[in-house]
Structure formats: C-alpha cells, structure tokens
A protein has these predicted regions:
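Catalytic Walker B motif of ABC-type/P-loop ATPase nucleotide-binding domains
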Residues: 130-134
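ABC ATPase NBD Q-loop/coupling interface
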Residues: 22-42, 81
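Helical segment within the ABC ATPase nucleotide-binding domain
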Residues: 144-156
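Helix-to-loop junction immediately C-terminal to a conserved catalytic motif
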Residues: 13
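Conserved ABC nucleotide-binding domain
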Residues: 32-33, 92-108
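A short, surface-exposed alpha-helical micro-motif characterized by mixed small hydrophobic
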Residues: 170-172
Length: 207
C-alpha cells in the first residue's frame, strides 16, 4: 500500500495530473494534453477494484450501456441493437462466461461474476490498453482461476496491465512484473527475477 499503483493509473487515465514528467501512449500520443474522455477515446480503458455495474439492470442491459455509451441512459436501453452489435455483445458475454446469464439482474450475480461483467463492459468499448485494478479481491478460488484464464485470453488481443497484491495470482498471469515503491519502479522482469531481486527482498520482506 502507498507504493503509487493507483496514482499511476490515475495519471495514465487523466484523473490526476503529474507535477512533472511525460506520459505517452505508444510513440506519439501525449496523454497530458488530453482530457479523461479523450484518453478513453484513444483506446485506454480502466476497471476499478470495486465493480460499478447497474445492479437493478440485467446483464444484457449493462452490456448495452457499454455499447451505446454516446446516448442518454434510457435512450440507450430503448435503442435497437444492430445485428453486428448483438453479435459483439454475445461474443463478449461468452468470453466473460455470462452468455447464459444475459437476462439476470446484475445484482443477483456473485462478486466474481460482477467483476467479469464489468470487464465485459470494458471490452465492448474496444480499448487497446486495459488497466485492471485488483480484480480478484474477495473472489472464491474458482473465480480467481477463471479470472486468470480470462485475463490471459484478453492479453492475447490487447495490452493488459493488472494491479494486484495476490502474488500467486500474479504468478499465474504475468509475463512481466513491475514492483513499485514510493512512486518509483523498484524492479521489473519475470516473476522469478523480481522475487530474487535484493532490493525487493529488502523493501518488502525486510531481509
């Protein structure tokens, strides 16, 4: 805690402006000159730790809101989806394991399923970079394993950055691990490299 993980995501998404430095997406897009909405439009999506789904609406309606985000809420729900949009929704629902739950109120879903629903909503916005904040906090072991597989699948299609304290979960998904300490990068590399790094051992294990 306090290493700077959430602040890093806040800076990338435009919620917080840094005192100094530069933030580029790819080689050319200077994020410091963009608003939060513009940053989302260039392809950066964020999922917060606590699920923020509409619990009284069905899974289908929540996904519809993600598809039709350029209209007012009730207008979005009344709008007819095109065949292509329905296909995209079904594909996302299948990918997150909720295809059979489309008509269920989101409030009836388990904690893990709500997390998956929000990931599905993010998917429908077609981000090139997904920022996922502590996705498995409060999940059952089975949900954690399903989430690990989901994030691995997503990483084959786009860049995915996950902030997480559960090291076993990190080990199961990460290709590259970055350790932050007091707002700075302390170490980066494979899980084995990071765990063997003397600086990480000193700071986080007190040895």
């Amino acid at each position: 805690n306090g290493a700077g993980k959430t602040t890093l995501m806040d800076v990338i998404t435009g919620k917080t402006r840094p005192d100094e430095g530069q933030v580029f997406f790819g080689d050319r897009i200077d994020l410091l000159h963009l608003t939060e909405a513009q940053i989302a439009e260039v392809g950066i999506g964020r999922k917060f730790q606590k699920p923020t789904v509409f619990e009284r609406l069905s899974v289908r309606d929540n996904l519809t809101l993600a598809l039709k985000q350029d209209r007012r809420v009730w207008a979005m729900l009344r709008a007819r989806l095109s065949g292509a949009e329905r296909d995209r929704m079904d594909e996302a629902a299948a990918q997150i394991g909720l295809l059979d739950a489309l008509e269920r109120p989101a409030g009836e879903l388990s904690h893990g399923q709500k997390q998956w629903l929000e990931i599905g909503m993010l998917l429908l916005q077609e981000p090139r970079l997904m920022l996922i904040d502590e996705p498995v906090a409060g999940m059952t072991r089975g949900e954690i394993e399903r989430t690990a597989q989901l994030l691995q699948d997503l990483a084959g299609e786009r860049s995915v950055v996950v902030v997480e304290h559960d090291m076993e979960f990190v080990r199961s998904i990460a290709r590259r691990v970055t350790v932050l300490h007091q707002g700075h990068v302390l170490a980066e590399g494979s899980m084995a490299q990071v765990q063997a790094d003397p600086r990480v051992i000193e700071v986080y294990l007190g040895e």
